[in-house]
């Protein structure tokens, strides 16, 4: 099977990537899916819960209501909202640190904590100011907004130890590595989850990974190489780069697993104006019915693009019915 964007986020979390850990916990908190973390994988959420209750005491955290699922038991919804807010703020800080480490990601537009005007309770996004629905951020230092507070640092190190120490999670991730990959040629067909990064004109897009650029098949293979290094190498610079690559695959516009210009998580929590929620899709999706481009992709991955039996079998195809998509 082929890794998807959520698979890669879990792989990153199991590898010890703080940004991926925070992403996995935030999504679980948003949907009230605590059982998977606590009962399924033995992840200890108590340090995060204690921190959240202390830090956001008196804050109703209305922007952080639990979307809910069949398994969600709202025993203490106030605590759940606080936990949800605490990990979300931590996530934005960790993502900011990661973006600063990797200017080649070209994700500066996602650095929003330093664009907050705490007095006016607004945030500037793409040059436009928006009022914030929530501006209670006791752990954000205006002079160093992406730095974790001491309490947040302790929480994340405990979560990291819990993810790394979960035998069941590590066993499941080992299975993803043993049986999964970025792409798979099979019976003359090409399988992958998301997209092949393309330019607006349909040509293969060059994407920087480390000190070099890659496109098409070479890009998929180089990214997979770094993912495996990020999990299997001993602690060090290369392992950390591999883990950062996992987060890149989760959220970057040039990721073959994501394929959108940006991930507007911050806006959806704090800004009422839905116009800033838009996540433009990769140029790839314009060419799904273009025989020339599809043939070029199949050929690039070593298949016969002219064969009538050759197909691209593609996952990650969200359809917005309310917007008229089919």
Feature names for model-found ranges:
Residues 1-326:
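Feature recognizes metal-dependent phosphohydrolase scaffolds
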């Amino acid at each position: 099977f082929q890794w998807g964007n959520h698979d890669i986020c879990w792989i990153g979390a199991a590898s010890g990537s703080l940004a991926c850990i925070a992403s996995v916990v935030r999504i679980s908190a948003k949907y009230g899916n605590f059982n998977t973390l606590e009962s399924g994988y033995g992840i200890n959420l108590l340090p995060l819960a204690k921190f959240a209750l202390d830090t956001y005491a008196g804050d109703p955290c209305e922007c952080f209501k639990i979307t809910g699922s069949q398994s969600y038991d709202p025993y203490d919804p106030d605590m759940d909202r606080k936990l949800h807010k605490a990990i979300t703020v931590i996530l934005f800080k960790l993502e900011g640190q990661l973006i600063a480490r990797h200017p080649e990601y070209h994700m500066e537009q996602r650095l929003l904590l330093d664009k907050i005007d705490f007095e006016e309770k607004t945030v500037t996004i793409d040059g436009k100011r928006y009022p914030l629905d929530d501006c209670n951020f006791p752990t954000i230092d205006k002079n160093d907004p992406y730095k974790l507070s001491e309490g947040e640092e302790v929480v994340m190190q405990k979560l990291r130890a819990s993810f790394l120490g979960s035998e069941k999670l590590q066993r499941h991730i080992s299975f993803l590595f043993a049986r999964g990959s970025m792409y798979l040629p099979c019976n003359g067909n090409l399988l992958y989850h998301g997209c092949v990064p393309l330019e607006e004109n349909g040509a293969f897009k060059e994407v920087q990974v480390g000190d070099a650029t890659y496109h098409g098949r070479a890009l998929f293979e180089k990214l997979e190489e770094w993912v495996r290094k990020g999990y299997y190498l001993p602690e060090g610079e290369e392992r950390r780069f591999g883990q950062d690559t996992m987060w890149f695959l989760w959220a970057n516009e040039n990721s073959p697993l994501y394929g959108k210009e940006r991930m507007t998580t911050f806006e959806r929590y704090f800004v009422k104006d839905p116009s800033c929620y838009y996540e433009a899709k990769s140029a790839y999706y314009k060419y799904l019915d273009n025989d020339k481009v599809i043939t070029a992709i199949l050929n690039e991955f070593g298949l016969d693009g002219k064969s009538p039996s050759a197909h691209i079998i593609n996952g990650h195809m969200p359809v917005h019915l309310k917007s008229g998509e089919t």
